[in-house]
Amino acid sequence: MSDGEEKPDGFSFAGIAAGLKDSNKKDLALILAPENSICSGLFTQSIVRASCVDICEQRIKKSSGLIRAILINSGQANACTGDYGIQHTLFATKEVSQLLGINEEEVLMCSTGVIGIPIQIKNLIDNLPNLVKELKTNSLQNAAEAILTTDLVDKKITIETFIEGRKVKISGFAKGSGMIYPNMATMLAFLTCDVGVDKEEWDKMISIAVKKSFNAISVDGETSTNDAFIGINSGKKIDKKFLSKIQSGIDIVCQSLAKNIARDGEGANCLLEVLVEGAKSNSDAIKIAKSICNSSLVKTAINGCDPNWGRIISAAGNSGIDFKLDFLDLYIGDFQILKKGKLNKYDSKKVANYMQTRMNGKYLVEDIVSISLHLNSGSEKGTAWGCDLSKKYVEINSEYTT
Amino acid sequence: MSDGEEKPDGFSFAGIAAGLKDSNKKDLALILAPENSICSGLFTQSIVRASCVDICEQRIKKSSGLIRAILINSGQANACTGDYGIQHTLFATKEVSQLLGINEEEVLMCSTGVIGIPIQIKNLIDNLPNLVKELKTNSLQNAAEAILTTDLVDKKITIETFIEGRKVKISGFAKGSGMIYPNMATMLAFLTCDVGVDKEEWDKMISIAVKKSFNAISVDGETSTNDAFIGINSGKKIDKKFLSKIQSGIDIVCQSLAKNIARDGEGANCLLEVLVEGAKSNSDAIKIAKSICNSSLVKTAINGCDPNWGRIISAAGNSGIDFKLDFLDLYIGDFQILKKGKLNKYDSKKVANYMQTRMNGKYLVEDIVSISLHLNSGSEKGTAWGCDLSKKYVEINSEYTT
């Protein structure tokens, strides 16, 4: 399968079935970046990390971001696998480097899937020549499929714009919260951009984008052993005054992927979008919004189409960020629930009906439940995303699998 | 109804139905402490607090803990009720003080129930004379019932010991995580002790006990607008060398109530008890244990009797506390799962069977799923408690109530 859209110049992608998953679905992906590409990565903050994550960090640092290839496997997360973890990562990246004729230090590896079971290394190695052969500029779709675990849909986006007559493209793909035993949600996301940006600047831009996207979503408040976001740029540089335009593009790609992940959370029926305005800082706003998205009580209320504003305000109150109850304006959809902290007259049946409609709306178009909270204490704002908490979530995650 | 057990000397209790709840169940409680009693209180850290909580804090501080009475109502939480909040609290505590012939500053008030709806103040005030008339030394049971919302069982405990021939008693009662629309879990707990302890010492002792009990439980990670723990002591003082014995007693009472609350979490089938040993500090150990108790993925795995150790380790890794994966010993029940970070041979069917048995075991006797994690990095330990996450939890909290 190939994509219709034009991808960032110089990058090629591959995704194949290498027999790592029992399902025989695609499970091995590769991204090849042009020479002199600049790479930044942000990785799980968990103490328990897969060793492939450590190697990613080390190699990006050591090479000052001069990374050429990223190998990604699904099926086994290669975490908590003792000495196998690092051995298999080193072995696989070395093989890839030899096939591509590059330095092994220029190859990264990300894994997602079952924890505690060694990677199916023989199948992986045997299929590397085939994987490399499949590298094409228009195979991003295959790569996006190959990194999925039990995600219900693939998650990818390409955007383009013209800057001084030059066509500029940014592509991203990601996987979200699939579950395989014994496992947890893992987030992997990759971004490519065909405008050259210096390492230091790129680090900043990636970090800004992640703060407003992947770090602003929550499916179930869990951080995985393998979470990773890697962004690579390559190509002719651009006048500094246009960098803000590139930043906007990266933000759009990251937010789109992040929303896709939240919406595809286990058992979810809607995307929950929480906007907090009137905060003292953007990060305060995001913290409050995230606290609301993270609340089991808010998430179950949404699942039940119950405009339970007390839970929303209480979750905001638990964010650790100071605000005045008497200043709050709260909206669910277009319905104002609180006005300067006091209950506004609203038709709770209409609000419930709004939620009900959204719970059954068209995927990522009309299935967004919006909550907005104005603190009236500053001029900054921020958004976070989540999903409802359903019986299906419990079912998926409590399935008897041993 | 009166209790069989002997309660702390000098304290009396009452609990009646005052028409605050639609169910006509008991909904108004009173604790009367002897003159010169010493009171300490710990309250919700949420930014959104009921004004009765503010008044509790102010009065305890202003009087240096010289508190005589605590009025507690269930039915309405008196939070997010605008000016009514403080007016009703002041009115009710003033009335109580006049009926008891004490200073209004010596009366505290705690509320739990529906948020955003004013307290049924007329019913409350009309019933105060009756409440005061009901005060008896052996009516703790009535008080314990009157503070419940949708708790399935009442939660109370009295312990006694002899110190140099003197009989010493400590009693406590609490309510946990009931739900009424629009509402969230509220925890209220009260402790009385008939040994006199100075304010400064008592503050410390209460704070130590709470850290190891109420602050170490999680039903769904939510903090309420009204959470409160209040401990009062009164009576002859005791040689300082015996204070550690009193501390142990307070710890036992608080932990018993805390475990009761965790076990009675919505939809729960078991008590989850997580012991973390070999930590650098007690608070590190509790943080890790709590992170495990808080994990939706661990809680659903337990609900499914799935010995999903990857989720346990991952939750530990998200606690923010540093540890070495290679040092970890992990047990579920008596089954060793990890040995110095490596998978131990165990019969996963037997582990699943252990969990299954516990999920159907006798209430708070044989229904405890134990997880223990040894970090092998220090000599401190700590325990936290939670419960499984069931479809019933989602059902209870997503019920369509508007």
From Swiss-Prot, chains A, B:
DNA-binding among keywords: no
A Pfam short name: ArgJ
Catalytic residues in the record: T186
UniProt binding sites for substrate: T149, K175, T186, E266, N397, T402
One GO process term, biological-process aspect: ornithine biosynthetic process
Pathway: Amino-acid biosynthesis; L-arginine biosynthesis; L-ornithine and N-acetyl-L-glutamate from L-glutamate and N(2)-acetyl-L-ornithine (cyclic): step 1/1; Amino-acid biosynthesis; L-arginine biosynthesis; N(2)-acetyl-L-ornithine from L-glutamate: step 1/4
GO cellular component terms, A-Z: cytoplasm
Residues under site feature: Involved in the stabilization of negative charge on the oxyanion by the formation of the oxyanion hole: T112, G113
Catalysed reactions, semicolon-separated: N(2)-acetyl-L-ornithine + L-glutamate = N-acetyl-L-glutamate + L-ornithine; L-glutamate + acetyl-CoA = N-acetyl-L-glutamate + CoA + H(+)
Class in the EC hierarchy, top level: transferase
Keywords: Acyltransferase, Amino-acid biosynthesis, Arginine biosynthesis, Autocatalytic cleavage, Cytoplasm, Multifunctional enzyme, Transferase
Disulphide linkage map: none
Coiled coil segments of this chain: none
Localization in the cell: Cytoplasm
Record-linked Gene3D superfamilies: ArgJ beta chain, C-terminal domain (3.10.20.340), L-amino peptidase D-ALA esterase/amidase (3.60.70.12)
SUPFAM superfamilies referenced in this protein's UniProt entry, alphabetically: DmpA/ArgJ-like
Superkingdom of the source species: Bacteria
Annotated site residue numbers, Cleavage: A185, T186
EC number: 2.3.1.35, 2.3.1.1
GO terms for MF: glutamate N-acetyltransferase activity; L-glutamate N-acetyltransferase activity
Family to which this protein belongs: Belongs to the ArgJ family.
Purpose: Catalyzes two activities which are involved in the cyclic version of arginine biosynthesis: the synthesis of N-acetylglutamate from glutamate and acetyl-CoA as the acetyl donor, and of ornithine by transacetylation between N(2)-acetylornithine and glutamate.
Quaternary context: Heterotetramer of two alpha and two beta chains.
Protein's name according to its UniProt entry: Arginine biosynthesis bifunctional protein ArgJ
Naturally occurring in which organism (per UniProt): Prochlorococcus marinus subsp. pastoris (strain CCMP1986 / NIES-2087 / MED4)
Taxonomic lineage: Bacteria, Bacillati, Cyanobacteriota, Cyanophyceae, Synechococcales
